[in-house]
Amino acid sequence: MKVTVRKEAGGGYSIYVPKKDLEARIVELADDRLWGSTATLDNGWQLELPDLPFDTRLPVTVEARRLAGD
């Protein structure tokens, strides 16, 4: 699914899922890195994010895969 990843003012990250009109904060990263990792959102979803360069400019829309969550 297409998601938009943004950097928040406080230093964290959030994800917007346009298909679901959902915005959620990333609360945990499996490998302590954003790209090529599994992100857990504050609503319980887990998304597998693509492996992109560390310095990718945000916000960016990417194809993510949902692994778990309602």
What feature does the model see in each segment?
Residues R33-Q46, D51:
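Acidic, low-complexity, intrinsically disordered interaction modules
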Residues K20-E23, V27-A39, G69:
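Exposed regions on extracellular, virion, or secretory-pathway luminal proteins
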Residues R6-G11, D31-W35, P53-F54:
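Short, ordered beta-strand-loop transition motifs
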Residues S14, D51-D70:
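Short, surface-exposed, low-complexity cationic segments
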Residues M1-E28:
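N-terminal acidic leader/helix
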Residues T4, T38-T40, T56, T61:
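Residue-identity detector for threonine
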